[in-house]
Amino acid sequence: MSSETLLRFFLAIGIIVLGAAVYWFFNQHLLVRAKNNVFTLFKTLPNKPVIVYFTTPDCVPCKTIQRPALDKIKTLLGEKLQVIEIDASERPDLAQRWGVMSVPTTFLLDANGEARYVNNGVARVEKLMEQVQTL
Amino acid sequence: MTSQSLQKVDHSALKTNQLIIISLNILAFILNLPILAAFVALMMGIGSALKIPGFGFVYKNLLKPRGWMKPDVLDDNPEPHRFAQFLGFIFMTAGSLSLFLGATILGWGLVWLVVALAALNAFGGFCVGCAVYYWLGRFHLSGFTKQPPAGTFPGMKPKVGVRA
């Protein structure tokens, strides 16, 4: 591999990292929005971790991947976790307030109701478990 | 947003197209291969002419039959996505020509612009070309007749539950 190719490789990595950083800041922005709007879902704090799951009836990946993943995690954790499902087509107001732009989108809130993670798109059970365990 | 007939659009085919465009363009940049960027432009041009995603055949013949990618069929307008690909083709052609003419910064800049827009679509669900299509439609330009699916921000991937 020539030095020019190496230089271009690292330049490409740099550009990709920059793009990822922009994406990270966007996710942080979503978490702040979720934090500010958590009381649109709860009157009092849930006192346990919560997954807020935005979906729609016709979303195929929601049915084939996201729903089974959430069912599995609910079975594994039982009462230790609350899952709130929101149909974004029925509640566009909530989707807008939480900054949801596509489905499925899952927010993970800790016991204090603070949004800690957001997954834009499908989040598999392993990833959700990993995130829940840090809450 | 008025009542209009939407069609079934498989967003997995579009996503495959975007991911291949991203990969090949980055590879073209790393290996300094303007010919590869020109190939991407050519495929996008062929796709635009045939009204299909340029690299959609990879999804149709390889990824979908083997179950490596599942269909994500949504009620949507195909026209804005075709327009978006056509815009990409224009940028890629301009980028490739610039590279062949020695304007490397402009050329790679245009190629990276296509990468960024395709990544925004593939990972963020926002299609800039589609947004431009809907924006032009507001000026009643001929050929830009479709409106975003109800309840969908122009350019965003439909949240479905969408009714024609």
Name each region found by the language model.
Chain A
Residues 59-62, 106:
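The canonical Cys-X-X-Cys-His
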Residues 1-36:
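N-terminal targeting signals for export/organelle localization
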Residues 45-57:
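Short active-site neighborhood of thiol/selenol oxidoreductases, capturing the structured segment around
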Residues 109-135:
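Non-catalytic, surface beta->alpha helical segment in thiol-disulfide oxidoreductase systems
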Residues 63-75:
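Typically the conserved alpha-helix immediately C-terminal to a functionally engaged Cys/Sec
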